[in-house]
Amino acid sequence: MLQPKRTKYRKVQKGRVKGLAHRGSSLAFGTFGIKALEAIWLTARQIEAARIAMTRAMKRQGQVWIRVFPDKPITKKPAEVRMGKGKGSPEYWAAVVKPGKILFEIEGVDINLAREATRLAIHKLPIKAKFVVHKDYINA
């Protein structure tokens, strides 16, 4: 699963996801992709589940790029612990995703196979997302 090798700080503030994604909102590597339509904290497990679903559907053909990285540590307090007494310990890692962000890109497969692979991957994600095609793609 994806997580940073090392970080400057062990815990980060919660923050808010506001506005649309301007950086990373267009296809840069592949011909097809998955674009997020909602804001969310995408966990490393969710990213990995979507990646596995996509690569299995493509039968190891083509190439997949993951365009989001889980670099935000999400903390959690143990069960049955009273409020207060400081922040909990880091539990898992998440990527902050804004609407319009490209999550995955695919190259080297047929458009029908890419559409099916992304459909399966989107089902693994807890948000609305859509299949996108590069503007220079010619359907041969």
From Swiss-Prot:
Organism superkingdom: Bacteria
PROSITE patterns with a match to the protein in the record: RIBOSOMAL_L16_1, RIBOSOMAL_L16_2
Gene Ontology CC, one term: cytosolic large ribosomal subunit
Listed InterPro entries: Ribosomal_uL16, Ribosomal_uL16_bact-type, Ribosomal_uL16_CS, Ribosomal_uL16_dom, Ribosomal_uL16_sf
BP GO terms, sorted: translation
Alphabetical keyword list: Ribonucleoprotein, Ribosomal protein, RNA-binding, rRNA-binding, tRNA-binding
One of the Pfam families matching this protein, by short name: Ribosomal_L16
Record GO terms (molecular function): rRNA binding; structural constituent of ribosome; tRNA binding
UniProt-listed SUPFAM superfamilies: Ribosomal protein L16p/L10e
Assembly notes: Part of the 50S ribosomal subunit.
Function: Binds 23S rRNA and is also seen to make contacts with the A and possibly P site tRNAs.
Family, per entry: Belongs to the universal ribosomal protein uL16 family.
NCBIfam families: rplP_bact (TIGR01164)
PANTHER family linked: 50S/60S RIBOSOMAL PROTEIN L16, LARGE RIBOSOMAL SUBUNIT PROTEIN UL16M
Protein name, per record: Large ribosomal subunit protein uL16
Designated gene of the protein: rplP
